[in-house]
């Protein structure tokens, strides 16, 4: 059995194509069922996010399976396959395993290390499990992908730094003020960006929020939303000393906070550090405020610079993540190959058992004066002969599976004993694995 | 035996310092872990070496420059391990361990014969004086290191340099906090060391205070600087940059006192 991946992502397709191919999560049942009803596709999972649409499936026929899934994608979304094909990529076997591990670990994301993708794959898998379109192989495969993602997250610092401006502001404030719990944030003006940053500060532990807006009512509304306190704009400088973090974004045509204002405030605060972010254009805060003792002023450009530096660091950490993925691929591949041999073992055993039963019945039928004791002994003897005969081939096959050389043995056995592995065997196998 | 442990210490401190210095340039969490293990192992070896020597001579190993420097180094590393544990600031090691290594290298270069100070000078006041002085020196060494780190980090923040070192250095508040805590440990000890030194000086047949003894005079200057710093912190809220600069000045004067001025009595 092989794992195949067919899909497209932000790397291969523009957004107009991605949105046409996307699957809606509440209507996912039908496409999932259609997918597993395709010829020789036994299991399927559909992952659909704004940056990627991918189908994970299992098949015996790699080329045919891949072609059928591509056709399915085109037909389902009513796009001619010829125009869709250029955006699609497909992987099978080891490359497919690598791809999914990388995607789950957020190594293939637009913003490397972003945490959403793992949740999105988990949700997609949840649907497949609910509608029973994923089976033994994809179940195990995706659980493995989740654990690889977890390893990458904990063993590298891929997600340790902020990659949005609002988060960068929080990170920067921590470098100055240390622990943010108990710190007070002041909003001057009520821009959207400020609001977002304030939200981040409050979820990061900051306690109080002061809002100074020219329109007092608007300031009051915003303050109420976050459980803060509105202050009249004219009293800004009387209240400024209460703020540890100041976010300013008024539409004022000139600066509203001058160095001497801040100097007085800093003295009043006994030089407790103050963190200023000026989001307004033109600026609200005189740049010379940054030269004052215990006052640290940053603009959006500064924050953007941090974001870029953090991105560079993430990309560096990503190479450590790639190493972890490579280690894990080998292990999973071994398991997948050993799976190949299991249905053969089951079929072989069934064939032997069938022969033993038939012969035993034939013998017992013509043997009238046999005591129940002797009958039991015969049963045990034949069973143990069968087990002894099967012991070595089973062990050899399992070993071969771990070394990835199963095809040779399973093919030979199938031919020699005329075995047919069926769907039923897979079910038995599943039971066996669940017991594990 | 104490020599064997002493050389073990030298090697372990050397390894730890190297690891901490590489950690400045390369961000590998594993490196910090190993540096910490090395310095901890070094500290244990150093402690054993010091205890062995004390048992051997029947006196605190603070009688010669060799012994004093070694003890100074031991106290620095002890203080570092304590603060590293409580604040989890690995990068502190990159600033502190080189100082401890320098002290122990200097110590190893000096004659290590066992000296017995004359019975007149043997007094609990002397031992108390020396012990407290060195522990306060160690505390001030940590203050010096965190002050230097503070100034560096502040420079990055004011000039908007967001490099790898900026990322590794802790927040200004944490460094200021460590500085302050060390000051509150170091200053009372230094005060007690000066007082017990004066009492001991009387016992040894001198005066409480001898203005001709340059070491005493410089100790007083050191004391005044740290007193001013503590006073400024407690009353007008001196902190951050101002406090860091004064701490560095205090440490420089302290080094002059320790190395530059010979004691009129013992050395």
From Swiss-Prot, chain A:
The active site is at 50 (nucleophile). Substrate binds at residues 49-52, 109, 114-116, 120. PROSITE patterns: GLUTR. Keywords: NADP, Oxidoreductase, Porphyrin biosynthesis. It catalyses: (S)-4-amino-5-oxopentanoate + tRNA(Glu) + NADP(+) = L-glutamyl-tRNA(Glu) + NADPH + H(+). It is an enzyme of class 1 (oxidoreductase). One of its GO terms (biological process) is protoporphyrinogen IX biosynthetic process from glutamate. InterPro entries: 4pyrrol_synth_GluRdtase (IPR000343), 4pyrrol_synth_GluRdtase_dimer (IPR015896), 4pyrrol_synth_GluRdtase_N (IPR015895), GluRdtase_CS (IPR018214), GluRdtase_dimer_dom_sf (IPR036453), GluRdtase_N_sf (IPR036343), NAD(P)-bd_dom_sf (IPR036291), Shikm_DH/Glu-tRNA_Rdtase (IPR006151). GO terms for molecular function: glutamyl-tRNA reductase activity; NADP binding. The record marks 99 as: Important for activity. HAMAP family: Glu_tRNA_reductase. This is Glutamyl-tRNA reductase. It comes from Pelobacter propionicus (strain DSM 2379 / NBRC 103807 / OttBd1).
């Amino acid at each position: 059995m092989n794992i195949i991946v067919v899909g497209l992502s932000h790397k291969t397709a523009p957004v107009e194509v991605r949105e046409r191919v996307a699957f809606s999560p509440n209507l996912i049942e039908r496409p999932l069922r259609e997918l597993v009803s395709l010829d020789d596709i036994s299991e399927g999972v559909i992952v659909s996010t704004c940056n990627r649409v991918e189908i994970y499936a299992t098949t015996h026929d790699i080329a045919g399976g891949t072609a059928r899934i591509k056709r399915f994608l085109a037909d389902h979304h009513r796009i001619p396959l010829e125009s869709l094909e250029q955006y699609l990529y497909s992987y099978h076997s080891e490359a497919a395993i690598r791809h999914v591990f990388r995607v789950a670990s957020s190594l293939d994301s637009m913003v490397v290390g972003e945490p959403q993708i793992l949740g999105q794959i988990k949700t997609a898998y949840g649907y497949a499990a609910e509608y029973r379109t994923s089976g033994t192989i994809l179940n195990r495969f995706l659980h493995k992908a989740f654990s690889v993602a977890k390893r990458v997250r904990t063993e590298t610092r891929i997600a340790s730094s902020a990659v949005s401006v609002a988060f960068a502001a929080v990170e920067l404030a921590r470098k100055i003020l240390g622990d943010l719990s108990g710190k007070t944030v002041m909003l001057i003006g009520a821009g959207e960006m400020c609001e977002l940053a304030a939200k981040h500060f409050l979820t990061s532990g900051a306690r109080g929020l002061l809002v100074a807006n020219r329109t007092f009512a608007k300031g009051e509304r915003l303050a109420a939303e976050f459980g803060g306190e509105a202050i009249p704009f004219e009293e800004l400088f009387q209240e400024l000393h209460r703020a540890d973090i100041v976010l300013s974004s008024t539409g004022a045509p000139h600066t509203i906070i001058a160095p001497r204002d801040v100097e007085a405030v800093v003295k009043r605060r006994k030089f407790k550090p103050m963190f200023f972010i000026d989001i307004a254009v033109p600026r609200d805060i005189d740049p010379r405020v940054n030269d004052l003792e215990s006052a640290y002023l940053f603009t959006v450009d500064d924050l953007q610079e941090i974001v870029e530096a953090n991105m560079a660091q993430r990309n560096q950490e990503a190479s450590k993540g790639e190493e972890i993925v490579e280690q894990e691929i080998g292990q999973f591949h071994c398991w997948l190959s050993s799976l190949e041999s299991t249905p053969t073992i089951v079929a072989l055993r069934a064939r032997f058992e069938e022969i033993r039963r038939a012969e035993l019945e034939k013998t017992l039928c013509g043997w009238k004066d046999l005591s129940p004791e002797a009958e039991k002994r015969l049963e045990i003897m034949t069973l143990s002969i069968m087990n002894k005969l099967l012991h070595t081939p089973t062990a050899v096959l399992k070993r071969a599976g771990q070394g990835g050389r199963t095809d040779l043995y399973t093919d030979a056995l199938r031919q020699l004993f005329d075995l047919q592995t069926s769907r039923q065997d897979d079910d038995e196998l599943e039971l066996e694995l669940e017991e594990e | 035996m104490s020599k064997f442990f002493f050389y073990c210490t030298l090697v372990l401190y050397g390894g730890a310092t190297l690891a901490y210095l590489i950690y400045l340039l390369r961000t590998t969490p594993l490196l910090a872990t190993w540096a910490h293990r090395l310095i901890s192992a070094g500290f244990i070896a150093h402690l054993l070496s010091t205890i062995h020597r004390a048992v051997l001579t029947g006196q605190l190993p603070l009688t010669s420059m060799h012994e004093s420097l070694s003890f100074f180094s031991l106290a620095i590393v002890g203080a570092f391990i304590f603060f590293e544990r409580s604040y989890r600031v690995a990068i502190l090691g990159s600033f502190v361990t080189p100082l401890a290594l320098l002290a122990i290298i200097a110590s190893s270069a000096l004659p290590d014969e066992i000296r017995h100070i004359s019975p007149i000078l043997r007094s609990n006041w002397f031992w108390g004086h020396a012990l407290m002085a060195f522990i306060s020196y160690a505390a001030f060494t940590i203050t010096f290191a965190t002050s230097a780190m503070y100034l560096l980090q502040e420079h990055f923040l004011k000039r908007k340099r967001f490099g790898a070192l900026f990322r590794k250095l802790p927040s200004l508040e944490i460094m200021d906090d460590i500085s302050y805590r060390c000051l509150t440990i170091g200053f009372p000890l230094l005060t007690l060391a000066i007082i017990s030194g004066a009492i001991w000086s009387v016992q040894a047949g001198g005066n409480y205070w001898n203005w001709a003894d340059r070491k005493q005079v410089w100790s007083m200057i050191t004391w005044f600087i740290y007193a001013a710093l503590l006073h400024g912190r407690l009353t007008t809220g001196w902190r951050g940059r101002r406090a860091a600069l004064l701490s560095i000045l205090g440490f420089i004067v302290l080094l002059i006192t320790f190395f530059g001025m010979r004691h009129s009595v013992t050395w």
